Structures are given as structure tokens and as C-alpha cells.
Regions:
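N-terminal glycine/threonine-rich, aromatic-flanked beta-hairpin/loop signature
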Residues: 38-83
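Edge beta-strand at a domain terminus
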Residues: 99-112
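Short, linear, compositionally biased motifs with a strong N-terminal bias
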Residues: 10-13
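Tryptophan-anchored aromatic micro-motifs
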Residues: 26-40
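Low-complexity, intrinsically disordered Gly/Pro/Thr-rich segments
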Residues: 83-97
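Bacterial signal peptide processing site
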Residues: 20-22
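C-terminal motif of bacterial Sec signal peptides marking the signal peptidase cleavage site
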Residues: 15-18
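Bacterial N-terminal signal peptides that target proteins for export
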Residues: 1-8
Length: 112
């Protein structure tokens, strides 16, 4: 009986994880692979987000659906397992390079 409950919960979690909101047209500049030496952020057009950061010797990572934008900031995850990414500088072009500042970290779009 417990196995069936666990299996049902796992299926529900997988189903909900695929329920991200697509990136709205006015935020399409957020889509892409962003990175610095200590942070990696992938935002896909369909609303999937992958994040990894090394800070103070601790690695934090997260994968989940995009829940939406609040101004320049965006929310990722489900319920209590969600996080708000604070964007102090939304995507902008500096010469040939696209940049964005998320959670105080300057990120570059594209391979480094």
C-alpha cells in the first residue's frame, strides 16, 4: 500500500514539474544559457529552469518550472520548493555580449 502511495506521489511530482509557464514575449531576452565562474542558469522558452551556484564552498542547485515574473524577478519551483531569483539588471547588451545580474552575480549569455 505504501509503495502505491509513493508511486502516485512521484508521478504527481513529475507531472507538476512539467507545468512551467512559457517565457512571455516581453521577457524573451531571459531565455538562454547564462553563466559566470561560480553560477550557471539555463532558462528555456518552454519555462524550464536549471540553476547551479558555488558560494562559500557550498554548491546549491535547482531544477524546476518557471512560475512567472514579478517585474524583472522570476519564480521557479513548486510550493515550498520554490525560489525567487532577484534580477537587479535585466538582460542587456554590452558590445557583442549579453549580460544580466541575478542574485548579485553578473552572468554572461553563451559559452564561456
Amino acid at each position: 500500500m505504501n509503495f502505491i502511495k509513493i508511486l502516485a506521489l512521484a508521478v504527481l511530482v513529475l507531472f507538476l514539474a512539467g507545468c512551467g509557464k512559457p517565457v512571455p514575449p516581453d521577457k524573451v531576452s531571459y531565455v538562454g544559457e547564462w553563466q559566470s565562474k561560480t553560477m550557471y542558469l539555463l532558462i528555456t522558452q518552454d519555462g524550464s529552469v536549471r540553476y547551479k551556484r558555488l558560494k562559500g564552498g557550498v554548491t546549491t542547485s535547482m531544477e524546476g518550472p518557471l512560475q512567472g515574473f514579478s517585474g524583472d524577478n522570476f519564480d521557479v519551483g513548486l510550493g515550498p520548493m520554490s525560489s525567487t531569483f532577484v534580477v537587479s539588471k535585466p538582460p542587456y547588451q554590452d558590445g557583442a555580449q549579453w549580460k544580466m545580474v541575478v542574485d548579485g552575480e553578473e552572468l554572461l549569455r553563451g559559452a564561456q
